[in-house]
Design a protein with these regions (language model features):
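Soluble catalytic domains of membrane acyltransferases
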Residues: 16-174
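N-terminal membrane-anchoring alpha-helices
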Residues: 1-19, 183
Length: 186
């Protein structure tokens, strides 16, 4: 029933389309790192929740620990939020990779920019998580100009960071975010 409601909101209220070869594979992939870009506005979070619900798959996301205060913490945990301390160097990549190894099913959604501001290069944490956990990366674009999301086929990192990042960044190059001037361009 929830899937029907999410899809109704996406299709009829905000007129958003979901395209790609692999939205069925999101559920068949028990483990993956899902990167969503461009992340330019706080509204992206709610659009992501709608897309995730419309596709009927579960995923978690990281949020700074400072946000997990009552009563907001209830909502964040309910929507899949995992609190992280970003202020200290606590080997976060290995900690997250160990979550994949301990669970039969775990999907983590991340914004590869690491901020809502414009960046010229993506941060690399998601990449190293995927390599260490031995899971594919699925790319999901939020194109506000065309009101659509495109989902990539699963991409298995080769370990050649330059090659892999060229491939990943090309997928998102020129996709217009909610705040156009913060969109990702190579």
């Amino acid at each position: 029933m929830k899937k029907i409601i999410y899809n109704f909101i996406l299709k009829y209220l905000i007129r958003w389309k979901i395209q790609g070869d692999s939205f069925s594979s999101l559920n068949s992939l028990k483990k993956s790192v899902i990167i969503t870009a461009p992340h330019t506005h706080w509204v992206d979070f709610y659009l992501g929740i709608l897309i995730r619900g419309g596709l009927d798959f579960k995923s978690s996301y990281l949020a700074k620990i400072e946000l997990f205060i009552f009563p907001l913490n209830i909502f964040l945990k309910w929507t899949g939020g995992v609190p992280v301390n970003r202020s200290s160097n606590n080997n976060l990549v290995s900690q997250i990779a160990s979550i994949y190894n301990k669970n039969k099913e775990f999907r983590l959604s991340l914004a590869p920019e690491g901020t809502r501001k414009r960046v010229k290069k993506f941060k690399s944490g998601f990449y190293y998580i995927a390599i260490e956990a031995k899971v594919p990366i699925v790319m999901l674009s939020m194109d506000y100009m065309n009101k659509k999301t495109i989902i990539s086929k699963p991409f298995y990192p080769t370990g050649n960071k330059k090659f892999d990042f060229d491939y990943i960044e090309n997928f998102f190059d020129g996709v217009i975010g909610k705040v156009k001037e913060y969109s990702f361009y190579k």
